[in-house]
Amino acid sequence: MVMTDPIADMLTRIRNANLARHETVEIPSSKMKKAIAMILLKEGFVKAVEEIDDGKGGILKITLKYGPNKERVISGLKRISKPGLRVYAKHDELPRVLGGLGIAIISTSKGIMTDKEARKAGLGGEVICYVW
């Protein structure tokens, strides 16, 4: 079966593993998925990101992060721009997620970055997802 939205699949796999309190989640790799995973790592939402070569496209192994009493660090993931309805925002219209507590991941002409980085660089782009 052909996957129509690989980014939504990635977010759903992370969301499901997080809700089931799994330690790791494995996702088929791509450049965009790796960039999103690296942002989640840099922003402190996940513990580690590892790329495994399986002879095909590769696999991203994401180690999820939990608090001392197994409380979830990621409380929500939401896909915004979908293949059927793309969502774009100018640099001055970039959304603030939960008043700055969460992040929006934006695909800009300079690569994939958070809403804060895009605002600072004065770049707009496609709003991929929200993480809080």
UniProtKB/Swiss-Prot annotation:
Instruction: Name any one GO molecular function.
Output: structural constituent of ribosome
What GO biological process term is on the record, naming one?
translation
What are the record's GO terms for cellular component? ribonucleoprotein complex; ribosome
Q: Subunit composition? A: Part of the 30S ribosomal subunit. Contacts proteins S5 and S12.
**Keyword set, alphabetical order:** Ribonucleoprotein, Ribosomal protein, RNA-binding, rRNA-binding
Name of this protein: Small ribosomal subunit protein uS8
* The keyword Flavoprotein appears for this protein: no
Q: Which family does it belong to?
A: Belongs to the universal ribosomal protein uS8 family.
The keyword Ribosomal protein appears for this protein: yes
The organism's lineage is: Bacteria, Bacillati, Bacillota, Clostridia, Thermoanaerobacterales
Q: Which domain of life is it from?
A: Bacteria
- Pfam families recorded: Ribosomal_S8
